[in-house]
Amino acid sequence: MKLVTAIFKPSRLDAVIDALAAAGSSGLTVSEVRGYGRQQGKTEVYRGAEYEVRLLPKVQVDVACSDEAAERIAEAIIGAANTETIGDGKIFIRQLDTVIRIRTGERDEQAVSV
């Protein structure tokens, strides 16, 4: 099993959720996060004063899935989150050792939606 974690611009969240549903995902977790990559934050002006915003708002989506579904999930996210501008984000695919559905006690493949 895999955990696909994507961090991207908040404005792309609805498009990513729709793309994941179309790719067969029926479960995900969404978190609001902050961070920076190559863009190193940005400078904003408020009431004539410049302020450096180092940590930019992003959205993190986590999808637990089968090994076979991981690439399909990642491609769906890329298609929906890509604006071809700096700061579009990153996708991390990690191995999951165990998944347990709390309600039923189901484990691993039976406990994930994809």
Where are the regions that the model predicts?
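Positively charged, small/polar-rich N-terminal and surface patches that mediate targeting and assembly
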Residues: M1-V114
